[in-house]
């Protein structure tokens, strides 16, 4: 059965409400926390969008439908900073369990920081963005045109290899970024194709914006109404036994 993951980056304040909304529909979420943002010891990468509080992060952790994973300390891909953020998270959560890590901007250099380095530092998994292959430069343009024109099939084709490689070598996760001008129908189509082809689906999200939100026009935001429609749709598919809502770690801990 297809497994679907909603993976939120940064721990922005609006993501708290979005994750609570998802939980209302029984949809699980992974929250990748940039610890310095939450501590308010570094300016957020999202500009006018503040971070969650530590108390909100812990409340979500206690929810049962939410996984907490790392996103570095100051939103960079420096290994020392990544480990620092992870250790801070472990302290907040009072856990010795391995936590996953999602790369900021999905720009982790695996030549500089190979996966074995993360395994040795007790990380459960590493997540970047889409699966890269020789067609990736062309796909970038197809995605842009598809988002502007609302094309579903061409957009899906650019992520077909990503869906086929959501879990690479049992450790390295890939996902589909959900961007501002992606329609609900485009994301629904991708989910349906994952079910049709019996693959998993991991969606990467950031701010979920209601009207008047400071980031409602930011590329990495998505509209509240679209997100709620997605949660309703995932719930309906789960009720029908067509997919299962899971956490990022569930893709590893089979």
Residues covered by each model-derived region:
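Membrane-proximal basic amphipathic "stem/tether" segments
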Residues: 1, 135-175, 218
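Boundary/entry segment of secreted carbohydrate-active catalytic domains
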Residues: 1-14
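A short acidic, amphipathic alpha-helical/loop segment
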Residues: 17-21, 113-117, 190
């Amino acid at each position: 059965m297809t497994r679907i993951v909603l993976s939120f980056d940064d721990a922005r304040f609006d993501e708290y409400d979005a994750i609570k909304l998802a939980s209302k529909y029984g949809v699980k979420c992974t929250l990748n926390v940039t610890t310095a943002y939450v501590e308010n010891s570094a300016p957020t990468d999202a500009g006018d969008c503040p971070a969650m509080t530590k108390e909100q992060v812990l409340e979500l952790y206690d929810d049962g439908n939410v996984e907490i994973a790392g996103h570095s300390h100051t939103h960079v891909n420096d290994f020392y900073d990544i480990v620092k953020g992870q250790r801070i998270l472990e302290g907040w959560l009072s856990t010795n369990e391995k936590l996953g890590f999602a790369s900021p901007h999905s720009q982790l250099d695996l030549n500089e920081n190979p996966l074995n380095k993360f395994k040795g530092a007790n990380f459960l998994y590493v997540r970047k963005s889409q699966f890269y292959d020789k067609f990736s430069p062309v796909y970038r343009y197809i995605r842009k045109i598809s988002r502007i024109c609302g094309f579903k099939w061409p957009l899906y084709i650019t992520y077909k290899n990503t869906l086929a490689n959501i879990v690479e070598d049992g450790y390295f996760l890939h996902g589909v970024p959900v961007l501002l001008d992606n329609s609900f129908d485009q994301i629904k189509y991708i989910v349906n194709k994952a079910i049709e082809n019996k693959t998993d689906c991991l969606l990467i999200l950031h701010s979920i914006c209601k009207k008047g939100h400071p980031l409602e026009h930011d590329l990495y935001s998505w509209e509240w109404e679209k997100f709620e429609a997605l949660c309703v749709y995932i719930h309906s598919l789960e009720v029908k036994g067509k997919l299962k809502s899971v956490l990022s770690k569930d893709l590893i801990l089979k």
